[in-house]
Amino acid sequence: LAYRDDTRALKQAVANARGADVLVLGTSRSMQLRGAFFASDSFYNAGGGIAYISQAQVFLENMPPDARPKHLLLVLDQYFYNETWTSIEPEDSAALRPYTQPDAFYALRRALADYLDGKYSLLHVLGTQDGVYGMSAAGRGAGFYADGSYTYGTAVLHPEKSVDAEFKDTFQRIAKNTNRFEYGETPD
C-alpha cells in the first residue's frame, strides 16, 4: 500500500475473509477505532473502505452473507452531506475494483526516489523489530494493525513535519473550494 492506494480493495477483501461480528466502515477518519475499544473479540476496522456514502451499501452487498457483521459502526464524514461534494462523485465510484498485485518496477522506482530524498534510512528499515512489515511501518512507525485500525506513527510525535502542519493544507483547500471543502448552500 505504500506506493499505491489500494486500501479500499484490501479492506473489502479482509472484511469478506474475516466476517467479524463488529465492523467499522468509513473513510480514513474512522481508522483510529481499535478492537480493544469493544467487548467483542470479533472486530475489524474497514476504515478507508469507502470515500463516498454510496460506496457503503456496495461494500456490504459485496460481503458474503455469512461474513456480514452483527454490528455495524458506519462513520459518516461531514462532506457526505454536501451536495457539491456528492455531485462530483464519479459515476463508477461504487464499482468494486479487485485487489491487484503492485507493479514491482513502479514501486522500486518510487522507493528509490524516496530513499534519495532522505525519507527513510536502509539501516533503520533493515533493523526493524519482528512484527513490523512494510516501508511505512519500518520508516515512520505508521501502518495498519491486524484489526484494521491505523497508527500514524511519527506523524503524531512530530506534527510540525506533517503536510497539514498548523492546518496549512486544510486552509488552502478551504480557500480553493476543493478536496472535500467544496462550498455548498444546504446540507444534502
Predicted feature residues:
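Membrane-embedded segments
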Residues: 19-114
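Secreted/periplasmic serine-hydrolase-like ester/acetyl group-modifying domain
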Residues: 89-188
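N-terminal secretory targeting modules
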Residues: 1-19, 67
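Non-catalytic accessory regions outside enzyme or core folds
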Residues: 6-9, 36-38, 154
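Short, flexible loop segments at the rims of nucleotide/cofactor-binding pockets, characterized by
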Residues: 2-4, 48-51, 185-186
